[in-house]
Amino acid sequence: MVMADQPTMFDPHERTSWYIDDAIVRLRLWGTEYAHPLPEPPAPRVSLKLGSADTCAVQLRDKAGRLSREHAMLVPEATGWEIHDLGSKNGLWVAGARTTKATLQAGVKIRLGGLTLVAESLKFVGLRSLVCRLLGWAPERHAEVDEALQSLRDSAIERTPLILIGSGDLAPVAARLHRVILGPEAPFLAYDGSDVSAAIHAAMNGTLCVPIRGHARASAIADAVHAVEITARPRLVLCASKASQAAALGGKPGQFAVIAMPPLSARGDEVLRIVHEAGQDLAREMGAQSTGFTTHDLERLQTFKFSGMDDLEDSLRRVIVMRVWGVTAGAKKLGLKHSSLSTWARSKNRNLST
């Protein structure tokens, strides 16, 4: 096997606007919460050995027994952390390719023996938190969360088309993910059924979000996006309400990645955590210092039968503006009439105070 002598480097701004380009702060074991923190300034940055030996700064346990005692070395460079193979028997694999050394970028997979690690920055940790909110925090969801994170990274960097499966309007979910992985300045367009060419042009270097309302239409849009030169091609996100819609597009060029969101009705005790985390994000976006949620609000919100994440966020916005600005000013902030917001809150199935 021919091995590259030069470090494998991925410039997130050369072909993409991958927004998660901050410093690597930890290595996390794939499919788990177990992470190895790395030194950060002002702490001195020194080279760190990875392996099974107790003399390694990052000591790892490989049940498969394929990890060398001194398998790899993390080396601090001006551009960030580099990882070097130390002549290990089973080699160093970064982003799916065997190499002797590579510069670590946020989200990249590192395979050492029978172990897979993920290089994480603070922004990437934030993205993982969002994906856990969408998919679940339970241990049995951890591997699925990591697969989704890789799909999002591939969508941003490689323009791999993505299918989101879930209940309700998924465009707001796609938009939130877009802002995290591509940044707030990158264009995002929710397709409304108008001219496809104009929509693709408007979403260049950003994201084109398309609801799957018919296989033929979605397939034609996917073909049109795929025909665009990759450096300008928008990321394509197709939104489906059921897995069968995604399966019908499985053979299209570019190999679709799929992220399936479980219904909120199946999230059980996690709903309260979703409300807290989503509420904090929404309050910050609206310029509020806190959500203002009362104990009664939280009790009532847990009983709501939300149609999807968009419905949940819409409800949280309404409660936040009422608590922070009051019904009159809050309704105005959302572009609603005072009576509309008040009626919504006092309806029998909500029973929220105003």
Task: Name each model feature, range by range.
Residues 52, 76, 85, 114, ...:
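Flexible glycine-/small-residue-rich
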Residues 1-63, 136, 146-150:
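Intrinsically disordered, low-complexity acidic Ser/Thr-rich regulatory segments
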